[in-house]
Amino acid sequence: WLQGREVWMFSMLYNKVEKRQEWLDCAVQGGEFLKKYGHDGNYNWYFSLDRSGRPLVEPYNIFSYTFATMAFGQLSLATGNQEYADIAKKTFEIILSKVDNPKGKWNKLHPGTRNLKNFALPMILCNLALEIEHLLDPGYLEQTMETCIYEVMNVFYRPELGGIIVENVDMDGNLVDCFEGRQVTPGHAIEAMWFIMDLGKRLDRPELIQQAMLTTLTMLDYGWDKQCGGIYYFMDRNGCPPQQLEWDQKLWWVHIESLISLLKGYQLTGDRKCLEWFEKVHDYTWTHFKDTEYPEWFGYLNRQGEVLLPLKGLFLSPTVPTGSSIFQS
């Protein structure tokens, strides 16, 4: 999970910012480590390893696969190494084969009782398709992009709920009245909208960009804590108490992804509301998440904006969100 994100970051910086040898060296070192230890031999990617490369957690998490694909896709561009390209393509094929059951045999839910489709995979595929565009057949790429756009903007986007995006629906795309079915994750929804804007730009579809920009504004207004400031982590579309104990925490990545989406929205549409919201989120982010004494940012705040955990090097806290935000800006 984490190593894939870091390999992608250093490869992307080398490809798009500056040909700095130290960035390429870091990317190749990480890529070789992942190639040797990161999967089970069939490109099922472990969630975590110990320091020597022994697996700690089985390859249940589909995002380990997506981040490996992104990593080796960018690394293949940086190095011209065909083996890296083949790893990215093979892993992408495995991801698509897992769409209906991302966790596979590690899925702990009982089948048939309450089967739900989750927003996270279609969301990340919107980004992933463009990340490895250079490796895919054009027809295959086009089909994948259209499928992702449909899932995000026609299945999880719900105009009958005021234009918000829900986190789970049933397998037929219907709303479900349960904790999972009522869940709204503002950070996921807002992050997905800058992926959709990128697709709209790539496909020359200004109406898609406009819809994604407006959805960003809707989700920010919906997810913003009117009392304490900041964006909620989890919400319930009916206003019921969410089941997640951390529902009212303020997370660094949610705010950083929001800044990216707002900047893209303003750049691509010129809508002043994006700029106004950007300044509001920017002020909150730099005031609350930045460590004024030492480098790096805090990741987790309570509802009132106070630091919950001073530890910065958590497995969900890579340099990618912050670095990506700076690059996208």
Language model regions located:
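Glycan-recognition and catalytic cores of secretory/periplasmic carbohydrate-active enzymes
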Residues: 1-329
